[in-house]
């Protein structure tokens, strides 16, 4: 049994993307994973997702679009201020303006681009490109 459900979700998406699958199953489901999937959908990395209750913690069925080259969870979860986002972009993303970092802020889960516009710091959760 795994401890980090977000890492498992990102690995499941990455593996399904690499073998060319159209759908991926993520279990167990959580609100955090749902919010991360919503950000990924907003930026076009996945087509959509659906929550299914199975009386074992639920699961998400994710419809993949084939736009993900790499994705993963960031461990340990670094706290970041607005001025530090660029440092983490250089570390986790391959090029400037290519991909997103997913951040948990006081206003909810969003990309680092939205957090920078709203001048919010937060905790880094994942990267996608």
Swiss-Prot record:
Q: Name one GO molecular function term.
A: structural constituent of ribosome
Which InterPro entries does this UniProt record tie to the protein? Ribosomal_uS8, Ribosomal_uS8_CS, Ribosomal_uS8_sf
Cited PROSITE patterns:
RIBOSOMAL_S8 (PS00053)
Keywords annotated in UniProt: Ribonucleoprotein, Ribosomal protein, RNA-binding, rRNA-binding
Entry's Gene Ontology BP terms: translation
Q: Which is one Pfam family of this protein?
A: Ribosomal_S8
Of the GO CC terms on this record, one is: ribonucleoprotein complex
Annotated function? One of the primary rRNA binding proteins, it binds directly to 16S rRNA central domain where it helps coordinate assembly of the platform of the 30S subunit.
The record's note on quaternary structure and interaction partners says:
Part of the 30S ribosomal subunit.
Instruction: Please give the family membership noted in the entry.
Output: Belongs to the universal ribosomal protein uS8 family.
Q: Which NCBIfam families match?
A: PRK04034.1
Write the protein's name. Answer: Small ribosomal subunit protein uS8
Please spell out the taxonomic lineage of the organism that makes this protein: Archaea, Methanobacteriati, Methanobacteriota, Archaeoglobi, Archaeoglobales
């Amino acid at each position: 049994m795994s401890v980090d459900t977000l890492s498992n979700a990102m690995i499941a998406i990455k593996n399904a993307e690499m073998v060319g699958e159209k759908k991926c199953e993520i279990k167990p489901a959580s609100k955090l994973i749902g919010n991360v999937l919503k950000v990924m959908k907003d930026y076009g990395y996945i087509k959509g997702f659906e929550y299914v209750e199975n009386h074992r913690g639920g699961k998400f069925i994710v419809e993949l679009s084939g736009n993900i080259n790499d994705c993963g969870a960031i461990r340990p979860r670094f706290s970041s201020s607005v001025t530090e986002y660029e440092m983490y972009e250089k570390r986790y993303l391959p090029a400037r303006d290519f991909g997103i970092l997913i951040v948990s802020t006081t206003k909810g889960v969003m990309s680092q681009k939205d957090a920078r516009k709203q001048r919010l710091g937060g905790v880094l959760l994942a990267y996608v490109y």
